[in-house]
Each structure stands twice: as C-alpha cells, then as structure tokens.
UniProtKB/Swiss-Prot annotation:
Record's miscellaneous remark: The ATPase of I.tartaricus is of special interest because it uses sodium ions instead of protons as the physiological coupling ion.
Signal peptide region: none
Keyword hit for Ligase: no
UniProt main location, coarse: membrane
PANTHER family documented for this protein: ATP SYNTHASE DELTA CHAIN (PTHR11910)
Name of the protein in its database record: ATP synthase subunit delta, sodium ion specific
Assembly and oligomerization: F-type ATPases have 2 components, F(1) - the catalytic core - and F(0) - the membrane proton channel. F(1) has five subunits: alpha(3), beta(3), gamma(1), delta(1), epsilon(1). F(0) has three main subunits: a(1), b(2) and c(10-14). The alpha and beta chains form an alternating ring which encloses part of the gamma chain. F(1) is attached to F(0) by a central stalk formed by the gamma and epsilon chains, while a peripheral stalk is formed by the delta and b chains.
GO terms under biological process: sodium ion transport
GO MF term set: proton-transporting ATP synthase activity, rotational mechanism
Cellular component annotations (GO), alphabetically ordered: plasma membrane; proton-transporting ATP synthase complex
Biological role: F(1)F(0) ATP synthase produces ATP from ADP in the presence of a proton or sodium gradient. F-type ATPases consist of two structural domains, F(1) containing the extramembraneous catalytic core and F(0) containing the membrane proton channel, linked together by a central stalk and a peripheral stalk. During catalysis, ATP synthesis in the catalytic domain of F(1) is coupled via a rotary mechanism of the central stalk subunits to proton translocation.
C-alpha cells in the first residue's frame, strides 16, 4: 500500500520533470534497468536498503554502476536516493508506466492461445485490437495448450474468452 502511494507521488513528479526535459522514454528505460537490478541482485538491494550506508556512498555507487546512463537519469536516481525512495523503485516504475501509457494512449493486451500465432496473425490481431480500443496495443502472447483452440484476450479488466475449453465447459454444464 505504502509502496503504491509513494510510487505514484514520485512517478508523477519525475514524469513531469522528464516531460519538461523531453526525456520521458529515456528515464523510463533507466528506471526499468534499475528496477530489474533491484529485483534480481540481492547485493544491490541490500546496499540500497541498508540504513548504515551513507547517502553519498549510495549516490557514488549509483553513478559508478549506471555510468552509461545520461546525466538526467542519474540525477533522478540520486534524487530518489537522497529522499530514501530508491527502495520503492518498483512502485515508481509501475506508476510511471501507467502515466506513460495513459498520456500516449497505449494499452496492455494479454492474448492466450493453444499454439503460437504467426507474425501475420499477431499483426492482424494488433490491428483489430487497436481499432476496437482506439489505442496503441502492447501485445503479450501466452501459450496454454489447455484451452485446446481459439483464444482468450485480456484488455485491462475485460476478458474475451473464445476458447474451445470454455465452450466445452459451457456445454457440459448444460
């Protein structure tokens, strides 16, 4: 709960700064790299979270580890360190992405099929979904042989289940 609140507040603030500096995508990419490292590297997480490690040492470490980042991204990361908020990186990135998607009219769509669709089928599906939603579609394909055939499309909270498994279950229930 706190991570989401902190994440939202900081994401809104840094998104505004990034937008004013025309660095929205660059900052998202940088934050995402830091988040993945935070999730996957226990030593990095421990260093960032450890209360006895001074902020200046953390900033120095950030600048060294992420030296390939542009100065703008490094400044934002150091700001998060200064405010003791780098440990909330997951919430910040999640909220930042929500803002980015909303402002750029992008929607995540999860499509589950029994077999992998061809590139042509994926392109056609994206085209139809973009027409239906009026937004750019970020399509994630999942494979689940249990649905037998057909597909299940999830757009936000809406689920369109056109799987043979659901149809068989409906017939069986009678």
């Amino acid at each position: 709960m706190i991570e989401a609140q902190v994440g939202k507040r900081y994401a809104e603030a840094i998104y505004g700064i990034a937008e004013a500096n025309n660095k929205v995508k660059e900052l998202y990419d940088s934050l995402n790299i830091v988040m993945e490292l935070y999730k996957g590297d226990k030593e990095f997480k421990n260093l960032v979270d450890h209360p006895l490690v001074k902020k200046e040492e953390k900033k120095e470490f950030i600048n060294k580890v992420f030296s390939e980042f542009e100065k703008f991204s490094l400044d934002i990361l150091c700001y998060l360190v200064e405010k003791n908020r780098l440990s909330y990186i997951r919430g910040v990135v999640a909220e930042y992405l929500k803002i980015y998607y909303t402002k750029n009219r992008i929607v995540d769509v999860e499509a589950t099929f029994a077999i992998e669709p061809s590139e042509k089928q994926k392109a056609k599906l994206i085209e139809k979904l973009e027409k239906k939603t009026g937004k750019k579609v970020n399509l994630v394909i999942k494979i689940n042989k249990a649905i037998i055939a057909g597909g299940i499309i999830k757009i936000g909270d809406e689920i369109i289940d056109g799987s043979v498994r659901r149809q068989l279950d409906t017939v069986a229930r009678g």
